[in-house]
Amino acid sequence: MAPAKWLIASLAFASTGLAFTPEDFISAPRRGEAIPDPKGQFAVFPVSKYNFDTKDRPSGWNLLNLKTGDISVLTTDADVSEITWLGEGTNLLYVNGTDSVKGGVGIWISDAKNFGNAYKAGSIPGAFQGFKLAKSGDKINFVGYGQSTTKGDLYNEAAIEKPVSSARIYDSLFVRHWDAYVGTQFNAVFSGALTKNGNKYSFDGKLKNLVQPVKYAESPYPPFGGSGDYDLSPDGKTVAFMSKAPELPKANLTTSYIFTVPHDGSKVAEPINKRNGPRTPHGIEGASSSPVFSPDSKRIAYLQMATKNYESDRRVIHIAEVGSNKPAQRIASNWDRSPESIKWSSDGRTLYVTAEEHATGKLFTLPSDARDNHMPSAVKHDGSVSAFSFVGSSKSVLITGNSLWSNALYQIATPGRPNRKLFYANEHDPQLKGLGPNDIEPLWVDGARTKIHSWIVKPTGFDKNKVYPLAFLIHGGPQGSWGDNWSTRWNPRVWADQGYVVIAPNPTGSTGFGQKLTDDITNDWGGAPYKDLFKIWEHVRDNLKYVDTDNGIAAGASFGGFMINWIQGQELGRKFKALVSHDGTFVGSSKIGTDELFFIEHDFNGTFFEARQNYDRWDCSKPEYVAKWSTPQLVVHSDYDFRLSVAEGVGLFNVLQEKGVPSRLLNFPDESHWVTKPENSLVWHQQVLGWINKFSGINKSNPKAIKLSDCKVEVIDHEAGSYFDY
């Protein structure tokens, strides 16, 4: 380790103890979407909880009473990977990952009131998920997805012979995407049917691949696609799915289409919004998402962006008639928000949509025939919405949400009425005890061009008459935000309860504050966002007397990691005692190694070879910037990060070490852009929090705060000093 003066200021900081620890954070129960039964009496949701003693994560399913809010255990069988309502009373279909077919799954039918009394309806010969069901005569038609072979069969990894060579050969992009190299198999939506014999349903094992007949199509689209990428019409006859435009280069453009196809696959799927097609509004050629059929199965609502290479363009609601050549209608197209999901009311007259607004994921309603200037109405609820479903045939919805202060909020919301709380995790889980909205507040500051929002997150037991070091956290994206939602990776409450006041800014480039703020970061990564951050820091220094900026730290991931590297070479870098850069770009020209070229080609106004000056403009590795480096910096980068190569982190660490800047590299060979495995997450928190606590003085003021020595992973240290010491 290079010798250096690691100075710690000895200040009388407020000591918070450790109300919310990384262990609490990682081991707290994690609950999924609550899905109500057809009559709106009960909802089923998954739950899991990591155990540090046994090193496993037991999982199961619970039943939520929508009248009382009471929760009961439905099953603790970890092999049950998915449950959905059959559409008949309290009958359920569930998927069991252990099956007689090696590598396959079993389809089981049960009743929520007597779950143990289940029967097997059939087997599917491969991994399969995302069931959607609809009655069609005496059958229940279904769709779901798995991976497809090039021939169109459901891919079963257990049945594939291992090739004698490990070579990969590519003639087009992608080569790798997010955390994996692209192979010959691809995602596809398959259809099938359950047939009723007496009182029981059975599945004959026959699946129809609805995607493979369209050459180069894929749905759901990786890495984050899921069941929201397709839908089954209520009459069970038609399927809609989203795929990237098959005829266009996928790594360079975001253009995608909504396809429709008969459930039985009797015709090849066709796009309803092909660019320059007769049904597509003029100039609309961006990414499509969230197809959903109307209750009468005659219309499809979907979202689409305009720009063909911009993943953060504004989404606009479109409605197309099934089987018609009429152009799709744009709904509330002047609304300066970007919807994320849609559902129809039972009468088809109202759309319920989610959209981010001012750092909160909100639920809105609007008429399904709304004109361009219509402004949707917000529905009252707590926290941010992650999913919602209608309660029976009413206008009320069951919201699955979360917030900065709770990882699960189940509530009933009805337009024009107060929300009704069912279950809030922070009021039940001992790991979340003491968390609440009182420690969170918004902050608005004049930025480089407009007012900029931040969150102030205070530690448990906060005392305004005491002083707390600043933790300045910069989000990724850059087109993203610090929202009022729970993060399972970078969670401001964990940082705050080390003894900090967290400031989480939403500078230029952030989403949810109007499309202009999002767009304004284009080709300006180190410009307006940096100025915004500096102005926020100055405001905190001058106005928040309970925040000690002299002993503050700054940290960020992805774009936030880039910004930390940029700050290190700028004036703001001298304002912090320590920095943490997680998966941030370092060398401007290295961006060409990313997977999604459309991202950099949009954000830097051209290709790597045609607009090279734009890539070099915000190059953190320029000698004039590196010459200013002096703030201790922790670098985090993992091997499976194919969005930003691990070489970026290693190169950054190389320069920090050669310059003699106190520094450390944290690397995970089995993680990607995100660190998600529980034991790795614990080490991440021990190293990141231990690093900032060492330099901020927290370790002296709060004996219970995390120290670097708390991590039991051995440090690799082979040298006595810096290159420049000799």
Curated annotation (Swiss-Prot):
Residues 1-19 form the signal peptide. GO terms for cellular component: extracellular region. It comes from the Eukaryota. Residues 268-292 are annotated as: Disordered. Its EC number is 3.4.14.-. Glycans are attached at N96, N252, N485, N605, N699. It is found in: Secreted. InterPro entries: 6-blade_b-propeller_TolB-like (IPR011042), AB_hydrolase_fold (IPR029058), PD40 (IPR011659), Peptidase_S9_cat (IPR001375). The keyword Lipoprotein does not apply. Keywords: Aminopeptidase, Glycoprotein, Hydrolase, Protease, Secreted, Serine protease, Signal, Virulence. One of its GO terms (molecular function) is serine-type endopeptidase activity. It is an enzyme of class 3 (hydrolase). Pfam families: PD40, Peptidase_S9. The active site is at S558 (charge relay system), D641 (charge relay system), H673 (charge relay system). One of its GO terms (biological process) is proteolysis. PANTHER family: DIPEPTIDYL-PEPTIDASE 5-RELATED (PTHR42776:SF11), SERINE PEPTIDASE S9 FAMILY MEMBER (PTHR42776). Extracellular dipeptidyl-peptidase which removes N-terminal dipeptides sequentially from polypeptides having unsubstituted N-termini. Contributes to pathogenicity. This is Dipeptidyl-peptidase 5. The lineage of its organism: Eukaryota, Fungi, Dikarya, Ascomycota, Pezizomycotina. The gene is DPP5.
